[in-house]
Amino acid sequence: MKHLYALSFLMWLITLGSASAQTGRITGTVVTNDHQPAEFVNVYLKGTTQGASTDAEGTFELQDIQAGSYTLVASSVGLKSVSQPVEVRANQTTTVSFTLEVDGKELEEIVVRANPSLYVTDYPSISLRLKTPLLETPQNIQVISNQVLKDQQIFDMQEGVIRNVSGATRSEHWETYARIVMRGSRVASFRNGMNVTETWGPLTEDMSMVERIEFVKGPAGFMLASGEPSGFYNVVTKKPTGFTKAEASMTVGSFGTYRSTLDFDGKLSKDGKVLYRLNLMGQLKGTHRAYEYNNRVSVVPVLKFQINPRTSLTAEYTYQYVQMSPIGSSYSYSPNGLGDLPVNFSTLEPNMRPTTVNDQSLTLTFSHSLNDDWKFTSQLAYLNFDQVGQSLWPSSFVGDTLLRAASIWDILGVTKVGQFFVNGDVRTGALTHRILAGLDMGDKDYYHDWAQGGAITGASSFNVFNPVYGQVPASAYPVYDRSLDIRERGVRYNNQYAALYLQDEIRMLDEKLRLTLAGRYTTTGDADPYSGQVDAEKFTPRVGLSYSLTPSMSVYGVYDQAFIPQAGASFEGTPFDPIVGDNKEVGLKTDWLNGRWTASLAAYQITKNNVLTSDPEHQYFSIQLGQTKTQGLEIDLRGELVEGLNVTMNYAYTDGKVTKDTDGSFQGTQIPGTDKHIANAWLHYKFWQGAFEGLGLSFGVQHSSGRTAWYGAYDRTVDPSMPDYTRFDAAVSYQFGKMGVSLNANNLFNAQLLSGAYYPYSNFYYWQAEALRNYRLSMNYRF
């Protein structure tokens, strides 16, 4: 642990004489009359275009305000507006506090109008630890709001979430988890700021419990201990708001889809010190493939104890149950090529035993404001993923006949996470130091058993071009022995990590210029029966610079690192060094029309060194000569362009290539599983007055080209490219009073949409085909 002392060299003093300027800033908090933080409150200077909205802690910040006297106004739907005079002095910060009273009549009668909070968010969630507005953060962070998820009728992470962020694609389409690729590699999965990534997990969060989803592009030392340099996505679950309200919804759709949700939000004590949130969901869902289904139940209660105005404790329990068809059922197989079978082709039989998942987690979050400038937060979490089931895969092809095999697929994943961090501001003359310091710890145990199984015996031949179902007797399937606990019969993978992080965001020149100096020291330990124990440690620096050209436009640059421990050793017995990923990024961010819509442009280059490649002199061994380089351009736009028209639009160009290998034969090859061009758009227009008041119309398109399959990329006898992908969707909705109805149509033009590859080990193709045109009709009621 002597390397911990390396952190003492991370920060250094900066002496900079800043020119005198006649501007100051205003910061403050907004709470309700029962002392709860008020989120999404609009705070603005009357008679000007300068304003902001509060974050989840009720805090706000206005910068670059000309010195003088103003009237500061705070307003929000369901709260009585309040104003107060404020004096802004040059080179000083004015602190203001508001207490707003609930307007019961407005909450009861008002129909919430589209506003900048519906598609646009000013601040990251508390779980990302950053107090800095997104506009000023030197990193590409995109936030998908709950309203977007509702408009698109998304049920879980599998269903089109990635269309709302530039450059994201899915590499696998299993029903249990979302494997998302961005900037050339898989991104990590976070929930409420905690890394919950597993080899085949986590279970996808149902959107009924989700408040927002944050995509953080590139390495993020303030969150990631170790992992791919592509970034991560953070699912933020719903928390109590302090308002008493509820919402119910029912959905019916194609393929026998039936779904209901309930969302209750309110107070358990009259003084408002004990709050609750309860989300319930039940779902029966088939697919376009015969005998395939995914039925789910989720129960998510949250309790928040406001111990005093500065201290709170939040307890959240999540339970998700899934009963589904065997894993692997979503794939099609052919000896001839991709896509030469009908989209509804299935290898399933109607009498196959289901796979079940019980997913539970418990999270405790303690928050204490030491004073107006400093805050301490800690999180403890326990997650348990228990899967009992089987998988269905091809054994081989004999002509056009597919020989199918079933095997046990039991999993137990137990994750324990602890996080402790402190945020605060220190002012030294003309400089403000925004400090973030934290400790992350985690222990992940993962057991799997797929060692039992075999061919489906006694079955009649299964011709993929003329399949006949229902001919397999129950006795033909393998019988699995589960008499031993999976901890005894399964293969164990264990990952442990601990990391210290320290960051100083130095704000100068009236806080127009912001320099971030940070570093993380991480130790990891990985163990499995194949590679034994692999320990690694690494110090990763982070340097960022952001400058506000105007109050609504900033430019930034950032350098950050990530590392990935590697098991094994060379022929000489030398252990492999971790993969190191370096990210260099520059960008531009803008807010328009007082934050009603935002746009960002980012250019980056990620270089991964120490990648393993084959040893030319020793067969079956590897050496560390490999390198990949991914560079690209990302554009994101979201918000209300004109009154009533909310959009989410993005484009990404990704150029990922192998730049070094053993003999150079694969240099210049596109990184498997990447798409060169991805473009998405979603437009939602709502009429707010006139004969069509309450009517909403939506239209969306997803397109990607230059696609490369995961397998076969290094087999020169096979073309690894996949066909272009273009899908059109549309929706119509109507809101009348407290009730709303929405009809969504997906894949309007019945496009054949595929993702798959050639499997070189068995000489056949596998792919997944999306459904042709399908519908969802949803009704919701607020009370």
Q: Can you say where each PLM-predicted feature lies in the sequence?
A:
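Short, acidic, small-residue-rich periplasmic hinge/interaction motif at the N-terminus
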Residues: 31-33, 41-46, 75-79, 89, ...
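Short acidic/polar hinge/loop motifs at secondary-structure boundaries
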Residues: 170, 178-179, 195-217, 235-238
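Outer-membrane beta-barrel translocator/receptor signature
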Residues: 209-211, 222-299, 307-311, 360, ...
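Acidic/polar loop-and-plug regions of large Gram-negative outer-membrane beta-barrel proteins
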Residues: 283, 287, 299-369, 382-413, ...
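Structural signature of Gram-negative outer-membrane beta-barrels, strongest in the C-terminal barrel
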Residues: 308, 413, 432-434, 440-444, ...
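Membrane-embedded beta-barrel scaffold of Gram-negative outer-membrane proteins
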Residues: 367-381, 385-391, 580-643, 647-659
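Gram-negative outer-membrane beta-barrel transporters
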Residues: 624-712, 778-782
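C-terminal beta-signal and adjacent terminal beta-strands/loops
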Residues: 642, 702-712, 733-783
